[in-house]
Amino acid sequence: YATRYIAMEYHKRDFDKANSYVSSAFYGDTIIASVILAIGVIFVLFIERFLNISPELIVSVKLLFLLVFVNFFFTTIQTVFNSTSYIKNRLDITGLVRVVGYIVEIILYLAIFKLFPPQVWYVGIVMLVVTAINFLAAIWMFHNMTPELKVERKLFSVDAVKKLVGNGIWNSINSLGITLNSGLD
């Protein structure tokens, strides 16, 4: 949801305000993702108390869940960097990167399951590699296509976070309402 505000200020050429949204969204997302990652690590440590897992699969399942939470962390903090493709109307580049990610994903699954004995945590490794490709591409686009935008701690604004969270929550509630309403048809 931050992309909307970043793009509006960017196109108004108010780079100070755009950078305030960029920095606030980045640090806000990082804080949220870090808290969820910490909770996820605690969950992983005690996963057998929450889920019924065969003893021989516990380590593999723990690794998978840990990799899923790490993947979530990077996907979440990547969000602000993805705004560049919308700002510059270059969704084609993002689409191309996703296609490359899908191809890498297929190749990795085929290679890993051909070369090694099957393990459930391989799925987490492949997810993390694909996320790394998307993450690096988003950062490259951000720095090269929108050099006016920067993530700086001094530009973090609690007011900007409140605005983004407030509108984001309202948007989420609205989307939930639409989903529930369309599900009742």
Residue ranges and their predicted role:
Residues Y1-K12, F26, I87, T146-E148:
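Helix-loop junctions and terminal segments of transmembrane helices
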Residues R13-S23, S34-V68, L115-I125, V151:
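Membrane-interface helix-capping segments at transmembrane helix termini in multi-pass transporters
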Residues S24, A33, F72, G101-I106, ...:
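Residue-level recognition of pore/gate-forming positions within transmembrane alpha-helices
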Residues D29, A33, L64-V68, F72, ...:
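Residue-level signature of transmembrane alpha-helical cores of multipass secondary-active transporters
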Residues I42-L45, P55-Q78, I107, A132-I133, ...:
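Alpha-helical transmembrane segments of multi-pass membrane proteins
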Residues F73-V97, L110, W121:
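Membrane-interface junctions at transmembrane-helix termini in multi-pass inner-membrane proteins
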Residues N89-D92, I103-L136, W140, N144:
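Membrane-interface helix-loop junctions in multi-pass transport and translocation proteins
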Residues V120-G124, A138-G183:
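Interhelical loop/hinge segments that connect adjacent transmembrane helices in multipass membrane
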